[in-house]
Curated annotation (Swiss-Prot):
This is Urease accessory protein UreG. CDD domains: UreG. It is found in: Cytoplasm. One of its GO terms (biological process) is urea catabolic process. It comes from Burkholderia orbicola (strain MC0-3). The gene is ureG. One of its GO terms (cellular component) is cytoplasm. GTP binds at G24, P25, V26, G27, S28, G29, K30, T31.
C-alpha cells in the first residue's frame, strides 16, 4: 500500500461520526468491500451503513444476508435516477438517510455510504462524506487508472480490486501501480483481492489514520 502518514490527532466521541463514502463502477467490488469492512471493524466501532441503488434495495439485502451488520443498521436508498446526482449535486436523499440512522444510533462512530454503480466521474459531496474511497477493478483492464476522472485522481483512497484476475485479462499490475502513482501523485492507493481478504487491513488502517478514529 502507498500509505498515508500516521496522524498525531485522534477522533473522539466529541466529534461527529466519520462519514466514509464508497464509490466506483458497477461490479468493481463496492458492496464486497463494505461487507468486509463491517465484519472486520464492527467489534471495535459502532457502525451503520447506507446503500444506494436506482430502483431496488439489492445491496442492502446482500449485506443483510451476508451478516455484515444487524439488519436495522443497514439502510437501503432507492435513488430513482442517476447515482452520481444522489451523492453529489443533490445529496438530500442520502443526507436524510444519514440523519435517520444517527437518530436511531446516536453513538455511531462510522457511517458508511455506498453509492450506486457509476462512471469514473462520480464524486461525493463534502457535505455527505468526510473520506471517499473509490473502487475500480483489474477486470476492466490495466488502462483504467490512465483514464483518470475525479474518482481515480481525487478520491482519498483508490482501491484497485480483483488483482487475482490480472493473469486472466492480461493486465500488468506493475503498470497499473505506476499509472496510478502518475495520476494520483501522493494520494494513497491499495491493491486488493477482497474475496481473499487481501488488502482489507490496509483499507482499515487508512480509515483509522485519516479518520482520526480511536477505540
Amino acid at each position: 500500500m502507498n500509505a498515508p502518514a500516521p496522524s498525531s490527532v485522534r477522533r473522539t466521541k466529541k466529534l461527529p461520526p466519520l462519514r466514509v463514502g464508497i464509490g466506483g463502477p458497477v461490479g468493481s467490488g463496492k458492496t464486497t468491500l463494505l461487507e468486509m469492512l463491517c465484519k472486520a471493524m464492527r467489534d471495535r466501532y459502532d457502525l451503520v451503513a447506507i446503500t444506494n441503488d436506482i430502483y431496488t434495495k439489492e445491496d442492502q439485502r446482500l449485506l443483510t444476508v451476508a451478516g455484515a451488520l444487524p439488519e436495522e443498521r443497514i439502510m437501503g436508498v432507492e435513488t430513482g435516477g442517476c447515482p452520481h446526482t444522489a451523492i453529489r449535486e443533490d445529496a438530500s436523499i442520502n443526507l436524510e438517510a444519514v440523519d435517520r440512522m444517527l437518530a436511531r444510533f446516536p453513538d455511531a462512530d462510522i457511517v458508511f455510504i455506498e453509492s450506486g454503480g457509476d462512471n469514473l466521474a462520480a464524486t461525493f459531496s463534502p457535505e455527505l462524506s468526510d473520506l471517499t474511497i473509490y473502487v475500480i477493478d483489474v477486470a476492466g483492464g490495466e488502462k483504467i487508472p490512465r483514464k483518470g476522472g475525479p474518482g481515480i485522481t481525487k478520491s482519498d483512497l483508490l482501491v484497485i480490486n480483483k488483482t487475482d484476475l490480472a493473469p486472466l485479462v492480461g493486465a500488468n499490475l506493475d503498470v497499473m501501480a505506476s499509472d496510478t502513482r502518475k495520476m494520483r501523485g501522493e494520494r494513497p492507493y491499495v491493491m486488493t483481492n477482497l474475496k481473499a481478504l487481501d488488502g482489507v487491513a490496509d483499507v482499515i488502517a487508512f480509515i483509522e489514520k485519516k479518520g482520526l478514529l480511536t477505540v
